[in-house]
């Protein structure tokens, strides 16, 4: 049995505009009625369920499309986990700098050595373990 977009929107919690966008982008292709209404069958509803879980994992539509077009889910998810781990490392480093500055304030720059400001920052971070 087919569902119309209004029913699918209500059932899924996804806006009609988003459902239309998914169809337009080929992520959630749907059948059309004689009057060109979008019609969702059980298979399409199952695919929408998968899309929502992939979105919950933080995958973007490009990544979701790769999976739906046949790329191994494990590969896409592993890449996503690697990106997340990298972001976590960057944020942890930024947090260290913030905590250092909260404790000691911004270090005084030196005009006497011939280092650039960026090089001085790198040196201070290295010396202070920040």
Task: Pin down the residues of each PLM region.
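Short, charged amphipathic alpha-helical surface segments
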Residues: 52, 65-124
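Basic helix-turn-helix/winged-helix DNA-binding cores
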Residues: 1-66
